[in-house]
Amino acid sequence: MIMDNFDSPFQYNRPEMTVEAIKKSIVYKLIFLIGRSPREASQRDWLNATLHAVRDLVTEGWITTARQTRAEDSRRVYYLSMEFLIGRTLSNAMIAEGIYGLAQEALSELNVDLEEVLEKEVDPGLGNGGLGRLAACFMDSIATLGLPGMGYGIRYEYGMFRQKIENGQQVERPDAWLEKGAPWEFIRPSKRFTVEFGGNIHFEGKKCIWQDTEKVTALAYDQMIPGYQNNSAATLRLWSAHAGEVFNLADFNRGEHLAALEEHSANKNLSRVLYPDDSTWNGRELRLRQEYFLVSASLQDILRRHKRTHNSLENLADKVAIHLNDTHPALAIPELMRILVDDEGFEWKKAWEMTRNIFSYTCHTLMSEALETWPVEMMAKILPRHLQMIFEINDHFLEYVRTYVTTDNDFIRRVSLIEEGYQRKVRMGWLSVVGSHKINGVAEIHSDLMVTSTFADFARIFPERFTNVTNGITPRRWLAVANPQLAALFDKYIGSEWRCDLSQIEKLKPFAQEKAFKEAVADIKFANKVKLAEYVKSELGVELDPHALFDVQVKRIHEYKRQMLNVLHIIARYNEMLTNPEKDWQPRVFILAGKAASAYYAAKQTIHLINDVANVINNDERLKGRLKVVFIPNYSVSLAQLIIPAADISEQISLAGTEASGTSNMKFALNGALTLGTLDGANVEILENVGEDNIFIFGNTVEQVEQLRREGYRSFEYYQNDAQLRTVVDQIIEGKFSPEDPQRYHQLLQGLQYHDYYQAFADFRSYVETQKAVDEKYKQRDQWIESTIQNIVNMGFFSSDRTIKEYAERIWKVEPVQLGD
């Protein structure tokens, strides 16, 4: 079809959504873009050709969205995040465009299996955990709601790392996700900006001059994020680092070849790896440079876009909202101030008012170690002007506090942006609060704790700034893509509106007692368990019984997430099964996955212990296959899409008061897993929505945790007073699970015996008893299926569409673009 209304007077052939048109497009891309004959093409060639063909279908809506946003002169939101864990793009895009079945049929006519092709796509290495996946869900919702929004991140060449398990231990390998090509992205050669580091500053009157800097070039790559069947797409712009000059030609011509290329290589390091090891000073410096690289390039682009439309920055705060996803992009606050004051000539107080009205900030943690701080000495070397600007902001802020709040020196010391001490530090969480007009927590309990603990002093100063926006997940990715059989069942019963309005899923409630519906849900769950078992058998060589209860904990490995508590229970169960072999034990499969930060010794030791325990249990014939433990390496979005639909139990067992929200709890519940968890994060709201009969809650509450700390928590007393716990701990310490190295876990377990900051020992007994209740309920098949369905049908609140609507209305003040058909 020739179209001329989209870009008149230019004519073009609009891609058609028919089997024949898609088939022709794929073959055309294969021959003329990939350069392969259909007779010789590999599955990866077919993947890339299909990606290009589907990309064509998304592109027109993407361009139309951008054009309409400009035409309406809409206020726009820009979402800054160090991570965007977007997952595979092809299946998501085909569902968004409504062509999954058409593409499947088109490829089938070419004797190509779509499912096999999809498995060839590599997950983009753009994130690690929940922070990045949340950002990806948010971008999906921004596109689906037609909001004028754009994401900014870094195009990491090697991601975080590819996790291998060798001799039970995590080994980090480069995640070379780009080596097979990235057909979904558009390189933007004209969108390149200079990012400056180092140098020195001096004042000429009131004007600050930043000079003699080291320069790096940021080059843009765009990813389209398609909205769900609305002919719209949002932009995720990712920055790649390049040398300011390709290399020093003068050095090269003098024969100093390595010196000439050294700077080039060092500058490219800024976008090589997500979260470089920060256990060294150099690693910390690289991470600080990365964060500034992101915000500098992004702000230059944002201001360029604004000036293109308005020719002035006077109305910047009226037309631009910038959101900080955690503290990583917090340098955007002093960077915007620097640009407005130094480059654009704004008066300081006006620039500060504009800045505060532009920025908003999501706090994702209550743990002080996760709220970034940077040594003043380091920032003075790398970003001298920004450190000076932070000092100015701090002086202005503390003057306000003394004038309008209190002159108490202890209070002023606590809220200062600069932490005084042996090593002075810049508090990035504090900077984010002071420089933003809204600060939100991500679950009700988290937001309450945020204003009563972490940011209590700031809530006294700025009570109107703090709010809650509970996290959500996109049902397109986490049901339609991850669990297509279940999605099709829901379509059959209530239509497909739930895909873009998850509250519609409650329409399934009348069918919750219907035998045919219950059996269909149970059959789909079993089929998903079979699929996961086949993967584990193929990849790990471990045989799993899909009739067993699949108990799953998949998330970043961290002490506060308490994978150790899970392991302690697994060993306790193992001991009981050997003591009482004739008991009618519910068969269980414990599935764990997640990465440990490369420098996080305790987390890496936990992975080693899990694998040692798995090795002993899986090879103990006395268990007769009734207990299995598997650690699945290299957890990713794609693996999550395989694991989550197969889970019966979702382990959400962080210490109460430590998990801000969590979103895997929502994904599991939406796919019919029952939550086993503490009263932490979004577990509290899941409990409120699904009802206490359909969730397993254990452990101390936030208040009880704090009371234990106040009174002096002594973990060794729990060890002494609980015989079962004592046996388990002694077995690990004595080397039962590491006979070749009996001392292996001494340090790890002694840390629990004498410190146990996250109170695993305190919650152990409650956890073990609750696990027994899980067994009993699972044996009542009909009751279990009813609870499965109750979890699903009561998850309507936990959509990222609802979350983003709240951000748009209450924080960003942006409205949807009026999109045509």
Swiss-Prot record:
Keyword Transferase set for record: yes
Cofactor: pyridoxal 5'-phosphate
Higher taxonomy: Bacteria, Pseudomonadati, Pseudomonadota, Gammaproteobacteria, Pasteurellales
Gene name in the database record: glgP
Pfam families given in the database record: Phosphorylase
Alphabetized SUPFAM superfamilies for the sequence: UDP-Glycosyltransferase/glycogen phosphorylase
Family listed: Belongs to the glycogen phosphorylase family.
The protein's name: Glycogen phosphorylase
GO biological process: glycogen catabolic process
Alphabetized Gene3D superfamilies for the sequence: Glycogen Phosphorylase B
Enzyme class label: transferase
